[in-house]
């Protein structure tokens, strides 16, 4: 993968660091926009691609999975769940919730440690 660096010896997934990276990506893509059904595919693709790119640039020994859902805001709410079976000492996840007056966005990051 382009931009991949030899992993450092840090153990454990830093969810705060990943959260901040992905939040910046979401702000950059969705910030200032209103919900538009015609833009959803482009927006979600941009969010996951930018997030993966920035996470990989950290040079840590992880495989990343990033999911993104953008829905029009409604009084009915938006519910999502995920579950993982893995090594909690090295693998990790974080969820980023973003909203404005017209839409809600949920991004999940899953980081699975690469054991060499």
Curated annotation (Swiss-Prot):
InterPro entries: Tctex-1-like, Tctex-1-like_sf. It holds the Pfam family Tctex-1. The modification 3'-nitrotyrosine is found at residue 4. Keywords: Cell cycle, Cell division, Centromere, Chromosome, Cytoplasm, Cytoskeleton, Dynein, Kinetochore, Microtubule, Mitosis, Motor protein, Nitration, Nucleus, Transport. It comes from the Eukaryota. One of its GO terms (cellular component) is nucleus. GO terms for biological process: cell division; positive regulation of mitotic cell cycle; regulation of mitotic cell cycle. It is found in: Nucleus; Cytoplasm, Cytoskeleton; Chromosome, Centromere, Kinetochore. GO terms for molecular function: identical protein binding. Homodimer. The cytoplasmic dynein 1 complex consists of two catalytic heavy chains (HCs) and a number of non-catalytic subunits presented by intermediate chains (ICs), light intermediate chains (LICs) and light chains (LCs); the composition seems to vary in respect to the IC, LIC and LC composition. The heavy chain homodimer serves as a scaffold for the probable homodimeric assembly of the respective non-catalytic subunits. The ICs and LICs bind directly to the HC dimer and the LCs assemble on the IC dimer. DYNLT1 and DYNLT3 compete for association with dynein IC (DYNC1I1 or DYNC1I2). Acts as one of several non-catalytic accessory components of the cytoplasmic dynein 1 complex that are thought to be involved in linking dynein to cargos and to adapter proteins that regulate dynein function. Cytoplasmic dynein 1 acts as a motor for the intracellular retrograde motility of vesicles and organelles along microtubules. Probably binds BUB3 as part of transport cargo. Required for the efficient progression through mitosis. Belongs to the dynein light chain Tctex-type family. This is Dynein light chain Tctex-type 3. The lineage of its organism: Eukaryota, Metazoa, Chordata, Craniata, Vertebrata.
